[in-house]
Amino acid sequence: MVKESIIALAEHAASRASRVIPPVKLAYKNMLKDPSSKYKPFNAPKLSNRKWPDNRITRAPRWLSTDLRDGNQSLPDPMSVEQKKEYFHKLVNIGFKEIEVSFPSASQTDFDFTRYAVENAPDDVSIQCLVQSREHLIKRTVEALTGAKKATIHTYLATSDMFREIVFNMSREEAISKAVEATKLVRKLTKDDPSQQATRWSYEFSPECFSDTPGEFAVEICEAVKKAWEPTEENPIIFNLPATVEVASPNVYADQIEYFATHITEREKVCISTHCHNDRGCGVAATELGMLAGADRVEGCLFGNGERTGNVDLVTVAMNMYTQGVSPNLDFSDLTSVLDVVERCNKIPVSQRAPYGGDLVVCAFSGSHQDAIKKGFNLQNKKRAQGETQWRIPYLPLDPKDIGRDYEAVIRVNSQSGKGGAAWVILRSLGLDLPRNMQIEFSSAVQDHADSLGRELKSDEISKLFKEAYNYNDEQYQAISLVNYNVEKFGTERRVFTGQVKVGDQIVDIEGTGNGPISSLVDALSNLLNVRFAVANYTEHSLGSGSSTQAASYIHLSYRRNADNEKAYKWGVGVSEDVGDSSVRAIFATINNIIHSGDVSIPSLAEVEGKNAAASGSA
């Protein structure tokens, strides 16, 4: 067999060596071979002695959800009022204390929903609305928020050179003047208005396209806005510094945040907020580095909804903190229900690979991953019994139970799965901790079955396959069943098993000897079937604890097949409240499995009667 394999390998090698497959030449049908002729790299700020790389995130930021405004405006089919209400209450229940609910000056629907939020928000939740820097729109927005316990007016103005020059044809001085004018009007209509004193008014200004704005101009325009608003330490002004379009790597954004944080005056009266989009796929990284660089507040959406490629995913940012031992002050204990609301209201599915929330993020299909996870759980269970609480499981940075998931879905089994995957499912579904050799054998059967179906196997399918493959507890095939038995001890090592078994309709007496109950029963069945069985492996363990404890026994028997006299092996499993009974069940499960396979024949009626007669004669 080895020689044939070597010859086959040599033939394969010779076959490939004789063929020439030329390299693939890139066509560049649409992309440019040299993109530098069309695109230029971002001109990053020069920041010396940056401090943020040495910082750590040690506390939660202020969070603002803009799902109902930025997220909703980007949907192909925006939310209905009822969906907005459901979403709003889910955000409140998660723990968001700042929620941007609308653009109330844009439509009556947005205005009406703002009024709903004002009337139904808990006292500690601030309702935020976005508005352009125009007088009539600002007045309408203030009207929508009147009566709120806590409210934030959010104005914005594009400050990047490209937007000022191409879109608005506006100088820097004109931009500053417009931002200050809007700020003064908001102040006049809110915190300076005697009739509005029941509301705690806050103000947010966004230099839109901040990440593409020269740093010194971003500071200059915000200084002017701050002077117009006159914030306090108790109620600081919010400067939202958005990566409206992500144009550079996250470290550049962090440099921009640190530059702003170290150059803006009266820092104690300023709340720096991030608002990262995901155009380059780095929204989460930019947000986290922004916090390292001094940001106090984070804006975004659940699961990253938003314009184009979306806003930063607040679930990911929050849970990244959580898995580093820092409480995000947001409760995602039932993340599946959050996912359901987001998908139903947004009418956009969340990727199965989305961090933390995706259906597959706590699942392992790879055999090596499954084996590592199984070993991790086994060790962790032992450590927890000793009082250790730290979570240390390979491939699982988060305990699935913390977000409302169970362990059943952690390991999924397909044709690529190894012994650990199938063994994990059996451990979770039947409580059986399979011996290593049995794991290897069963995983092969599982892989073959998954291959034949061309899909993943469900837990109940794997359990059914196991019960059939190993005649679990002698429940599948019962060609021979035990009626009664007794084991007597002779001397220090010899045991004699006597009993009766039912073969078909006949009751047959059996007898065997060995150095223990297991070997003597195996000898008795060997005598009955005229086949020499031997115990190749035997293990047992307890199931459960306390009064409900059961024992599981695993028997691996060797024998020679009737057809060709070749040596073969079979496993069997028995479970009972009594360890002796569980081992007996395991032996009969194995013997009946061997008979069912056709490797060994059941005695004929004449043979059974002959054995009974012989037993009676010897008696």
UniProtKB/Swiss-Prot annotation:
Q: Which residues form a coiled coil?
A: none
Query: Gene3D superfamilies attached here?
Result: 3.30.160.270, Aldolase class I (3.20.20.70)
Listed EC numbers: 2.3.3.13
Q: Which UniProt keywords apply?
A: Amino-acid biosynthesis, Branched-chain amino acid biosynthesis, Cytoplasm, Leucine biosynthesis, Metal-binding, Mitochondrion, Transferase
Its needed co-factors are: a divalent metal cation
Report the domain of life of the source organism.
Answer: Eukaryota
Q: What do the Gene Ontology cellular component annotations say?
A: cytoplasm; mitochondrion
Q: Does the keyword Nucleotide-binding apply?
A: no
Reaction(s) catalysed (UniProt annotation)? 3-methyl-2-oxobutanoate + acetyl-CoA + H2O = (2S)-2-isopropylmalate + CoA + H(+)
Pfam families linked: HMGL-like (PF00682), IPMS_D2 (PF22615), LeuA_dimer (PF08502)
Q: What does this protein do?
A: Catalyzes the condensation of the acetyl group of acetyl-CoA with 3-methyl-2-oxobutanoate (2-oxoisovalerate) to form 3-carboxy-3-hydroxy-4-methylpentanoate (2-isopropylmalate).
Q: State any further remark.
A: Present with 6630 molecules/cell in log phase SD medium.
**Subunit organization:** Homodimer.
Q: Please give the family membership noted in the entry.
A: Belongs to the alpha-IPM synthase/homocitrate synthase family. LeuA type 2 subfamily.
| Annotated HAMAP family | LeuA_type2
Q: Write the protein's name.
A: 2-isopropylmalate synthase
What species was this sequence derived from?
A: Saccharomyces cerevisiae (strain ATCC 204508 / S288c)
